Design a protein with these regions (language model features):
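Conserved, well-structured functional cores that handle cations and Mg-NTP chemistry
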Residues: 55, 122, 126-133, 149, ...
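Conserved aromatic-histidine-acidic binding/catalytic patches
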Residues: 11, 15, 57, 61, ...
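N-terminal Rossmann-like FAD-binding beta1-loop-alpha1 element of flavoenzymes
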Residues: 2-43
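A conserved beta-strand/loop element that lines the FAD pocket in flavoprotein oxidoreductases
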Residues: 133-148
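Flavin (FAD/FMN) cofactor-binding and adjacent substrate-gating region
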Residues: 83-124, 152-157
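N-terminal FAD cofactor-binding segment of flavoenzymes
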Residues: 22-26, 40-99
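Short beta-strand to alpha-helix junction loop
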Residues: 64-65, 112-131, 142
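Conserved beta-strand-loop-beta-strand element in the redox core of flavoprotein oxidoreductases
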Residues: 148-172
């Protein structure tokens, strides 16, 4: 990828928000399209009860980021990790899951830090990720916009995606 590119991300779920953060960094314009309305302006608690996301069928379930993603957030986005923890997500380390007998003989290892899980309600994880992404340079959200297909071309045996077909207010 080159600087000054414009990247379209279809969906503002956890994967789409993660992609926007990975592709961003201030050198590219990132537009995140989502068929659902934006989250409420209030707290993560309010979002749990009022945010409607047709595109996220497991919205009100608990979710966990496994060790690798938790480590990536901790190392690359420490401010995001601090916000996630401040808003109620919890870290669960290897030692936290040991029963009494194993816990007594357990000797921590430096690499145990990379085994921690980050867990919370999905609404909390998405809300904080989204607010963090929205503050990054060049990131824009377009809500109530359903992606209906790709605008693509072939050149020299290669496929190039030039855009997306988007539906808004019943018009593609």
């Amino acid at each position: 990828m080159r600087a000054n590119e414009h990247i379209l991300v279809a969906g503002s779920g956890i994967a789409g928000l993660g992609a926007a953060l990975a592709f961003g960094g201030g050198t590219r314009r990132i537009t995140i399209l989502d068929r659902d309305p934006p989250p409420p302006a209030g707290s993560a608690e309010e979002a749990f009860y009022s945010w409607e996301r047709r595109g996220a069928t497991q919205l009100r379930h608990s979710h966990a980021f496994l060790g690798r993603l938790t480590t990536l957030i901790r190392e690359r986005y420490p401010d995001l990790m601090a916000e996630l923890l401040h808003e109620g997500t919890r870290l669960f380390g290897f030692a936290d899951g040991l029963n009494g007998t194993l816990a007594q003989s357990y000797v921590p290892s430096k690499s145990d830090e990379d085994l921690k899980l980050l867990f919370s309600r999905r609404t909390t994880l998405e809300l904080i990720l989204r607010r963090y992404a929205a503050r990054q340079p060049g990131v824009t959200f377009i809500n109530d916009a359903g992606v209906r297909g790709l605008i693509a071309r072939r050149e020299g045996g290669k496929l190039f995606v030039d855009g997306l077909k988007v539906e808004r207010n019943g018009v593609v």
